[in-house]
A protein has these predicted regions:
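N-terminal "domain-start" segment that seeds a small globular fold
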Residues: 1-28
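Loop/turn elements at helix/coil->beta-strand transitions in domains of secreted/extracellular proteins
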Residues: 32-35, 65-68, 95-99, 131
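Structural microenvironment flanking redox-active thiols in thiol-disulfide oxidoreductases
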Residues: 49-94, 105-112
C-alpha cells in the first residue's frame, strides 16, 4: 500500500482511561503489529453508523493476527454529554469489544491531546500505523 503521508513515527497515545483492556496500551508495546487507530465520538452520526461498526468488524476479523484495532474517544465538542460513564454505556450498547481509550483533554479544553498530535480534523478518523510504528495512512 502506498503511503498517503510523509514517513513519520506515530506519536504516543495520550489516554486518561481505557476500556476493554486489562492494562493500558502503548504504541511502543505494539511495535511489530499493524495498528488501526479509530478516532470517534459517541454523538457523531458518521462514527455511529459507519466508522465504529467498521472498526469492530476489523477487530473481529483480525483478532489474534498481527493487526490491532484501537478506539480513541476524542471529545472536542459536547463535553458535558461525553463522560467516561456515558462512553461505558455506549460501549455496552453497541457491543464494542476492541480496546478503547479516552483521549486526554487538551490544555484549553477544546482539542484533545492525541487528536492534536495526529492533526486530526474531525471524526471519524482512521490512522494506519505500520509494524515499525510509522504512520502509513491518515
Amino acid at each position: 500500500m502506498k503511503s498517503t503521508v510523509p514517513e513519520k513515527l506515530a506519536p504516543e497515545l495520550a489516554v486518561s482511561k481505557w476500556f476493554n483492556t486489562k492494562q493500558p496500551l502503548t504504541l511502543e508495546e505494539l511495535r511489530g503489529k499493524i495498528v488501526i487507530l479509530h478516532a470517534f465520538q459517541m454523538l457523531c452520526p458518521g462514527c455511529v453508523s459507519h466508522g465504529t461498526p467498521q472498526a469492530e468488524k476489523l477487530h473481529q476479523m483480525f483478532s489474534g493476527d498481527d493487526l490491532r484495532v484501537i478506539g480513541l474517544h476524542t471529545v472536542f465538542e459536547h463535553h458535558a454529554a461525553m463522560t467516561p460513564v456515558s462512553l461505558e454505556a455506549f460501549i455496552h450498547e453497541y457491543r464494542l469489544t476492541f480496546p478503547i481509550g479516552v483521549d486526554e483533554a487538551g490544555k484549553d479544553g477544546d482539542i484533545p491531546v492525541t487528536m492534536e498530535r495526529y492533526g486530526m480534523r474531525g471524526t471519524p478518523s482512521f490512522v494506519v500505523i505500520d509494524r515499525d510504528g510509522v504512520i502509513c495512512h491518515h
